[in-house]
């Protein structure tokens, strides 16, 4: 199952970019042996308003992909539950799973309709550049949980 992070806006060089890249690299190295590909990250151009950003986001989603929208009102999962869900989707034959990170204005109604499944990292609102790093870390953590390596200590 291919894992994709589709994020509105460009993550500039700096500690958040370094952290995100490090976790993506680490997750990718483990993913291959667990039946996953990626995670891959794609930056969607910001600007033009929520509807324009939404159209660009939707255009990048592979047909038939499972779409998970990152949202402060989304479902909160433990790391173990997140790993289990990824494993179940893989075992159910999902080809692509896309995690969406919206722009500063949020998600257009058509994106919300296309991606009713949501995920949150707590009830707080987080800066988008930190959400990318947090998602990349959770994907890496999920790979370590599924592989049984000692990174995750519950």
From Swiss-Prot:
Residues annotated to bind S-adenosyl-L-methionine: 70, 102
Localization annotation: Cytoplasm
UniProt keyword annotation of Transferase present: yes
Enzyme Commission identifier(s): 2.1.1.177
Alphabetized SUPFAM superfamilies for the sequence: alpha/beta knot (SSF75217)
S-adenosyl-L-methionine among keywords: yes
Major localization class: cytoplasm
Signal peptide boundaries: none
Catalytic reaction equation(s): pseudouridine(1915) in 23S rRNA + S-adenosyl-L-methionine = N(3)-methylpseudouridine(1915) in 23S rRNA + S-adenosyl-L-homocysteine + H(+)
Keyword field: Cytoplasm, Methyltransferase, rRNA processing, S-adenosyl-L-methionine, Transferase
Enzyme superclass (EC): transferase
GO cellular component: cytoplasm
The organism's place on the tree of life at top rank: Bacteria
Single GO MF descriptor: rRNA (pseudouridine-N3-)-methyltransferase activity
Record-linked Pfam families: SPOUT_MTase (PF02590)
Function recorded in the entry: Specifically methylates the pseudouridine at position 1915 (m3Psi1915) in 23S rRNA.
Family under the similarity heading: Belongs to the RNA methyltransferase RlmH family.
Subunit structure and binding partners: Homodimer.
Annotated protein name in UniProt: Ribosomal RNA large subunit methyltransferase H
Organism: Hyphomonas neptunium (strain ATCC 15444)
């Amino acid at each position: 199952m291919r894992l994709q992070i589709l994020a509105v806006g460009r993550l500039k060089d700096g500690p958040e970019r370094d952290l995100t890249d490090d976790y993506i690299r680490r997750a990718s190295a483990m993913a291959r042996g667990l039946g996953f590909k990626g995670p891959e990250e794609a930056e969607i151009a910001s600007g033009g308003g929520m509807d324009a950003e939404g159209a660009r986001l939707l255009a990048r989603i592979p047909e038939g992909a499972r779409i998970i929208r990152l949202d402060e009102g989304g479902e909160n999962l433990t790391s173990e539950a997140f790993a289990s869900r990824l494993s179940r989707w893989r075992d159910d034959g999902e080809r692509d799973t896309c995690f969406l990170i919206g722009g500063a204005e949020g998600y257009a109604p058509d994106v919300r309709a296309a991606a009713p499944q949501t995920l949150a990292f707590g009830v707080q609102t987080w800066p988008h550049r930190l959400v990318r790093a947090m998602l990349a870390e959770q994907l890496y953590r999920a790979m370590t949980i599924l592989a049984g390596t000692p990174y995750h200590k519950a």
